[in-house]
């Protein structure tokens, strides 16, 4: 009688799954962490709610109300979750039948769309972006049959550019009555004029992902939001865990979204954008850098001569960047989070010392 291992008992798609390689999972012994698009310094909060013997609210009112006020929408159009990553998964669980429906996304882009779908057993379809990293609308149209959720990251991670708003409108018209379009706006605080939040009334099938991990400087909190019309939110509420946010997380999130918290976030954005422009200008003068791409975010994508050697050389010096070589159309590319001036200088000095 053959022995069945524990791994044999697991679902086939889980056995075959390659987990998402987060910056933390990839590790490294760095002291300059520029690989996860985090804010470079800690922001301090004091806990005010100490009733930890009670379960938290499923959707903490102060957090929902504050976020709705900030985003300019109704509280009924907001769902809070454990990071935007949970929102990605909830949308698939609510709308996609495993083994029947598909999601669609446009690489090069964020890796969690595919991981979430594969974990649940939902087909992934890809339509690579055009040479300028804008949407291939004809390609998307050709592959929409059976697709229930389309993910579009704007500004896009890792390329840093915004998706053309007219293309978003065309996509929303193509998918009307067929699929949910998800605009991943994790980095929208760095270019707030480009948000699609004002489009929700016009498009009942639009959902928007947001996070406190980037401009709000709270990656360690794991707090994200899905903005959508009430009908979509009610469906997501059916599949979300009963207590997604712990009491301390809800406490700090509500403070971060207070009027003072919003002012502080906007000050951080101004500072990061100034630092980004400084770093872009410096990178353009460095011999081993072939190309620096425009960015609307808190990171910069650049193409390097001998990028793998450059990546390893900086890694060995404790400067951890994010290698994008395996992404479609990004051979030779590394992504650099915008950090402090001292961190920028470490990167610039290390790159200048590279022999090309």
Swiss-Prot record:
Keyword annotations from UniProtKB, A to Z: Amino-acid biosynthesis, Aminotransferase, Histidine biosynthesis, Pyridoxal phosphate, Transferase
Organism field: Escherichia coli O7:K1 (strain IAI39 / ExPEC)
Matching SUPFAM superfamilies: PLP-dependent transferases
Molecular function GO terms recorded: histidinol-phosphate transaminase activity; pyridoxal phosphate binding
Family: Belongs to the class-II pyridoxal-phosphate-dependent aminotransferase family. Histidinol-phosphate aminotransferase subfamily.
Pfam family, one: Aminotran_1_2
Pathway annotation from the record: Amino-acid biosynthesis; L-histidine biosynthesis; L-histidine from 5-phospho-alpha-D-ribose 1-diphosphate: step 7/9
Self-association state and partner proteins as the record states: Homodimer.
Gene Ontology terms: biological process: L-histidine biosynthetic process
Name of this chain's protein: Histidinol-phosphate aminotransferase
EC number: 2.6.1.9
Residues recorded with modification N6-(pyridoxal phosphate)lysine: 214
Requisite cofactors: pyridoxal 5'-phosphate
Catalytic activity: L-histidinol phosphate + 2-oxoglutarate = 3-(imidazol-4-yl)-2-oxopropyl phosphate + L-glutamate
